[in-house]
């Protein structure tokens, strides 16, 4: 499979999760936008991705609706794993004409922080850290050399920012600033933009 344009990174530590992505939207060497937000809060979850931007937007909308529907229907909140599995099923349903995207999905519930990686046909893998998109090979080296599950969220945010910056330096389809989403183990959410 060809690398999907963009870089998105997720990191799980004992204190919570951090997801980040750069903002460049490019197709075939042409920069279409420098303001493409690829990290989203969906209910009490975070989602980031690389790939066709319209597919990422559609998946975000679908997940917003499906999570709300589940919670209204059952009268209880959906767990992180169940929400990630729901996304996996949605992706698999479209396997003949897949969403051209790689997704990072995470959140915090009674089982603690969780991070999942999904490919275009719905493979679901739980991991401590992951990078997707065309800048992933660069970013993953930074993460592997410095990741520690015991680091606090501030250090985790610095590490993920360092990894995205490394990708921006070497990947032509990544750039134009960094969106950072942080969720602590109590479910508190913080969103930051870092110009770069």
Curated annotation (Swiss-Prot):
Offer an example of a GO molecular function term for this protein: threonine-type endopeptidase activity
A GO CC term attached to the entry? proteasome core complex, beta-subunit complex
Mind listing the UniProt keywords for this protein, alphabetically?
A: Autocatalytic cleavage, Cytoplasm, Hydrolase, Protease, Proteasome, Threonine protease, Zymogen
What is catalyzed by this enzyme?
Cleavage of peptide bonds with very broad specificity
Question: According to the UniProt entry, how is activity regulated?
Answer: The formation of the proteasomal ATPase PAN-20S proteasome complex, via the docking of the C-termini of PAN into the intersubunit pockets in the alpha-rings, triggers opening of the gate for substrate entry. Interconversion between the open-gate and close-gate conformations leads to a dynamic regulation of the 20S proteasome proteolysis activity.
Q: Which SUPFAM superfamilies match?
A: N-terminal nucleophile aminohydrolases (Ntn hydrolases)
Q: Where is the active site?
A: 7 (nucleophile)
Q: Where is this chain primarily localised? A: cytoplasm
Task: Tell me its EC number(s), please.
Answer: 3.4.25.1
Q: What residues make up the propeptide removed on maturation?
A: 1-6
The cross-references to Gene3D superfamilies, in alphabetical order and at most eight, read: Glutamine Phosphoribosylpyrophosphate, subunit 1, domain 1 (3.60.20.10)
Its annotated function is as follows: Component of the proteasome core, a large protease complex with broad specificity involved in protein degradation.
Quaternary data: The 20S proteasome core is composed of 14 alpha and 14 beta subunits that assemble into four stacked heptameric rings, resulting in a barrel-shaped structure. The two inner rings, each composed of seven catalytic beta subunits, are sandwiched by two outer rings, each composed of seven alpha subunits. The catalytic chamber with the active sites is on the inside of the barrel. Has a gated structure, the ends of the cylinder being occluded by the N-termini of the alpha-subunits. Is capped at one or both ends by the proteasome regulatory ATPase, PAN.
* Recorded family membership: Belongs to the peptidase T1B family.
Query: Under what name is this protein listed?
Result: Proteasome subunit beta 2
Q: Which gene encodes it?
A: psmB2
